[in-house]
Amino acid sequence: MNQVFFSKIRSLVSADRHRFKSKEMDLDLDLSYITDNILAMGFPGTGLEASWRNSIDDVCELLKQKHHGKYMIWNLSERVYDYSKLNNQILEFPFLDHHPPPLSLLFEIVNSLSNWLKADAENVAVVHCKGGKGRTGTIICCYLYYSCQFEIMDDAKNHFAEKRSKMKKGVTQPSQQRYINYFKEIVSGSHMVEEFVLTFRSIELGPLTKDQANSLSFEIFEHAKEPILNFASSSNSIQIVPINNDNSESNNNNNNNNNNNNNNNNQQQQLYKIIILIQKKVQNDVLIRVYRGDTGKGKGKMKKQIFHLIFNIAFVNLDQCLFGMNEFDHFKSSKKYDPNLQMECRFQNNCTGAPDHSFKIWNIMALQYQRTKSSLNNSITDIKSINEINSTNNNNILASSAPTPLTTTTTTTTTTTTTSLPSSEHSTPQILISSSDANLDLKNCNINCDSSSGGGSNSSRNSNSNSRGGSSNSSSNRSSTSSRSSITTDSIKPSCSSDSICNNSSICNNSCNNNNNNNNNNNNNNNNNNNNNNNNNNNKNSNNNNNESSSNSNDDSDSEASIRKRKNTLWSSGSSIKLKPSPNLSRLSLFNGHRQSFTKKINPNNNEENVDQKTLPILKKETNDPSESDIKNVEIIQD
């Protein structure tokens, strides 16, 4: 019962603020997750205060279970509590309730918050004041804008209000909103802060009634310091000046639609304004408090604050600042005063001292914000350009997926290189590989290329697979033999992977099916090659004579076919192959791990290995492609 009773009291105290509720941990806290790593909460109370505010034990349990060793607390209130329960993970930046922090302190708090969250992606910042809305919201909104999570400050304020309040009421005090705008203008580079000294000449406040003017008292502070001046209505330093009736009547007539009873009464009364002569040098932040005094005793005794006002000297335009009633802080009795009530502050810049141009913390943070924003814009531009390139490549792949007519010159097209078969007499097939990660599988005689070269046309592979159907030693089938012996078109098999540029699933499926068909054809061809090799061994003398006569009598295509036929035996699995690679080919990473200083041959009778000390000459060339001489220098040892 006690827990239910206290829970209802806490809900009434927190009013419209979102609460953190967990049945598993049995917690009900005045705490809200503004982002995944920023928390706003009310003051953690102890003893009797914990009955209507957050209990410090419950807060400690939540942080230890969900963010153990990764949390830091910012205490913005003027009060302290037992920090040892939270492992002393607390930073104190106290300033008054319903007030903004001084401008320099505002930047210090946001900078410390940013440094903590940048140190580790899992770090969590917990910010609290008394109620966890006004002062807390001022700091969090400035950080959300400074970290480039929101490009517009109003969006950051709306986000905080939505996450913290059920009625979407976040930072409501005018001076706190004013300092948030100060922060935005400085960080974005819209306003350059120069610390200088001005002479505060006077304050004018009106229109007021006679009783109101006689009961007011004033205090002027340099923010976060003791008051530098005190003024009461009974003293000689305050002048009460009547306002002209014509002006008052015209002002009242303009506001008849907005104010019914109050304006009718003001039209019948003489209105006044208060003029306070100050003549005091001030700088940085200025705080003005207005009180209602006790006029019954004829003294300017301070009784109750009506409102206060805070601004910074660096943002004074020309020689005056004008503030309306909607810019006064904590003005609860505003209905008793004229709606046109305003305060005018006059300054004079007649100081001989030069302004302070030293490098301040806001200058450093402004530079950091500009760098973060520029890097973010560059990353967004890069993402857009990458998306455009991907869409262009997808369109090109879809356009190239259509079948092309079969021609005598087979061409394999990839994303980066193009491989073709020349038909000249003394030319050899060229291997152009676009990826440096190519590997050679000598058993299956396949060159597995990287996914970057996986955009080859399917028509060329289909034409090659069709030409592998049968084999013969006659000259009429040499065209099929030459197409079967082509390294360029038969050995390159692109792999379909997730990193391939073939984003279209149908194209990848077709290419994979074609590769499966080609593998089946290769198995059949290997069996045919074994039979052909046996026939070649039985008819060696006759084939040599035929080859010599055909080499002298046939045309350029016959000589090219004979070269390809010899080369085809190198990749057949039926014979024992020993290769002496060229150093030029090793640069393509095709023969890595296969370089040997001698060749071995196996004697089938006694299963012993005999070392053949014959060495092969290595021809040095400037290109990376195998030439005809490289192929002729390969020793073929057959059983």
Curated annotation (Swiss-Prot):
Q: Which reaction does it catalyse?
A: a 1,2-diacyl-sn-glycero-3-phospho-(1D-myo-inositol-3,4,5-trisphosphate) + H2O = a 1,2-diacyl-sn-glycero-3-phospho-(1D-myo-inositol-4,5-bisphosphate) + phosphate
Catalytic residues, chain numbering = C129
Q: Which residues form the Phosphatase tensin-type domain?
A: 20-190
Keyword Protein biosynthesis (UniProt): no
Positions of the region Disordered?
243-265, 395-429, 451-498, 519-567, 598-628
Q: Where is the composition biased (Basic and acidic residues)?
A: 619-628
Where composition is biased (Polar residues), the residues are 598-608
Q: Which GO terms describe its biological process?
A: aggregation involved in sorocarp development; cell motility; G protein-coupled chemorepellent receptor signaling pathway; myosin II filament organization; negative regulation of actin filament depolymerization; negative regulation of asexual reproduction; negative regulation of phosphatidylinositol 3-kinase/protein kinase B signal transduction; negative regulation of Ras protein signal transduction
**Its GO CC terms?**
cell projection; cytoplasm; cytosol; nucleus; plasma membrane
Q: What does this protein do?
A: Protein phosphatase that negatively regulates PI3K-dependent pathways. Regulates cAMP signal transduction to control territory size. During development, a lawn of Dictyostelium cells breaks up into territories where cells aggregate in dendritic streams to form groups of 20'000 cells.
- Name of the featured protein: Phosphatidylinositol 3,4,5-trisphosphate 3-phosphatase cnrN
